[in-house]
Curated annotation (Swiss-Prot):
SUPFAM superfamilies reported in the protein's UniProt record: Thioredoxin-like
UniProt topological domain (Cytoplasmic) ranges: 203-278
Main localisation: endoplasmic reticulum
Modified residues (Phosphoserine): S245, S278
PANTHER family in the record: DUMPY: SHORTER THAN WILD-TYPE, THIOREDOXIN-RELATED TRANSMEMBRANE PROTEIN 1
Highest taxon in the source lineage: Eukaryota
Disulphide bridges, residue numbers: C56-C59
Lipidation (S-palmitoyl cysteine): C205, C207
Protein name stated in the entry: Thioredoxin-related transmembrane protein 1
């Protein structure tokens, strides 16, 4: 029995030691992990999000404070999350992460960047005292859910895909670097041609070109408002034409009279000369 009692003492000490070690007894992790697939859950409720990288020393120093702050999440009615920018490049593009670690506060779809001290106490006061109201929210044009940031996210993901493909071509397939560049150049030209054809097809469907019809002469229909002035103008033109025709007729009559008188005079002058010769 004495020998058994001696064995129980070290065993009990070992159990207590393991229980005292953080995480050894299945400690719950209250920090949620966000990805490109589930990030839309940020648009509902109140959130505190940390953007970090495993290789960042400042991010490593922040982790204990962030996990301690996450334990107060249920009491503060705030959800605490983190994003690994090395794996979730799309999210880093949506938020335009330029420094690590970066912390954002989100309340019902409004995003604000946290710029205060990075301790558990400061995080708690920031949420409980609603200090986030003193910070101007990010414009909807540059919000993570905007069209512009969606395109930025796609651009970040495309850059990672190109880099991964280049590494696969060079290291796994043994293609020279210049050969990989030629592949990407050909793919770029081909995608540009396909995109141009698609745009032309869409434009033709939305705005079809009208076929030109042969021009036909149609009778002009005038409104009653302009019919009376037009009639007056036509009557004046007809009157002017009549005046001109009358003047021309008078001139012709005068000319004919003059010619007849001159011919009579010539005859009268010619008669005595004939008698004299007789």
């Amino acid at each position: 029995m004495a020998h058994l009692g001696r064995l129980m003492v070290p065993l009990a000490a070992l159990v207590l030691l393991l229980w005292a070690v953080p995480g050894a007894h299945g400690r719950r992790n209250n920090v949620r992990v966000l990805t490109d697939e589930n990030w839309t859950s940020l648009l509902e409720g109140e959130w505190m999000i940390e953007f970090y990288a495993p290789w960042c020393p400042a991010c490593q120093n922040l982790q204990p404070e962030w996990e301690s702050f996450a334990e107060w999440g249920e009491d503060l009615e705030v959800k605490v999350a983190k994003v690994d920018v090395t794996e979730q490049t799309g999210l880093s593009g949506r938020f335009i992460i330029t420094a690590l670690p970066s912390i954002y506060h989100c309340k019902d779809g409004e995003f604000r960047r946290y710029v205060g001290p990075r301790t558990k106490k400061d995080f708690i006061n920031f949420v409980s005292d609603k200090e986030w109201k003193n910070i101007e929210p990010i414009s909807s044009w540059f919000g993570p859910s905007s069209v512009l940031m969606t395109m930025m996210s796609a651009l970040f993901q495309l850059s990672v895909y190109i880099r991964t493909s280049h590494s696969y071509f060079v290291h796994d397939l043994g293609i020279p670097a210049w050969g990989s560049y030629l592949v990407f150049a050909f793919a770029t030209v081909l995608s540009g041609l396909l995109l141009g054809l698609c745009m032309i097809f869409v434009a033709d469907c939305l705005c079809p070109s009208k076929r030109r019809k042969p021009q036909q002469q149609y009778a002009k229909k005038t409104s009653p408002e302009f019919s009376q002035p037009l009639k007056k103008v036509e009557e004046e033109q007809e009157a002017d034409e009549e005046d001109v025709s009358e003047e021309e007729a008078e001139d012709r009559e005068g000319a004919s009279k003059a010619t007849s008188q001159s011919s009579i005079r010539q005859r009268c002058v010619g008669l005595p000369s004939a008698t004299d010769t007789s």
